[in-house]
A protein has these predicted regions:
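C-terminal catalytic domain of Rieske-type non-heme iron oxygenases
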Residues: 1-169
Length: 169
């Protein structure tokens, strides 16, 4: 299934929504924070990169021998494909996010999310499971991440500052 959001955010700011998990404990306190830790690893591959964040279940591996570790059930993998796409590997499904500018309006974008399951849905129970997962993802992005981004975009658009430096230390 594919769903489309049209946030009033520049497309590059929309992409920023997915670039770190440190905000989970504040912005997503009651939604996904109980599922994930707010730490992550970062690896680059040219203009592309990968983020790995641990699920809170990772503690179950504490007493496992290194040879028997199976990390995959205890992480989420976020793969950024330059310039505008993310593949998010969850425990049991994939999400493909594609983010584009919206016409000639710099303060708007289109975010398309396609949700992929390993097998076609075969029962009402499976349909309800996947719908619940999809609804959670869309709720978090549409009602938590993007409204914050829209507030930031409003600040940019207010012209309260003469200039903005981004990416310098």
């Amino acid at each position: 299934e594919t769903r489309v959001l049209r946030p009033k955010i520049n497309w590059k700011l929309s992409i920023d929504t997915f670039l770190e998990s440190y905000h989970f404990s504040v912005l997503h306190k009651n939604s996904i924070n109980p599922i994930f830790y707010r730490s992550q690893t970062f690896d680059t591959y040219g203009l592309n990169f990968r983020l790995i964040s641990p699920r809170k279940t990772i503690g179950e591996l504490k007493n496992s021998s290194p040879a028997s570790l199976d990390l995959l059930p205890h992480i989420v993998g976020i793969y950024f494909l330059f310039p505008n796409s993310f593949v998010i590997w969850q425990l049991d499904h994939l999400e493909l996010w594609e983010i584009y500018p919206s016409g000639n309006t710099p303060g708007e974008s289109v975010a398309q999310m396609s949700f992929f399951t390993p097998e076609p849905v075969r029962s009402k129970q499976e349909e309800e499971h996947w719908e619940k997962n999809l609804d959670l993802v869309m709720h978090v992005v549409e009602n938590e991440d993007f409204p914050l981004g829209e507030g930031i975009q409003n600040g940019f658009s207010s012209q309260a500052q003469d200039y903005l430096s981004f990416g310098t230390s």
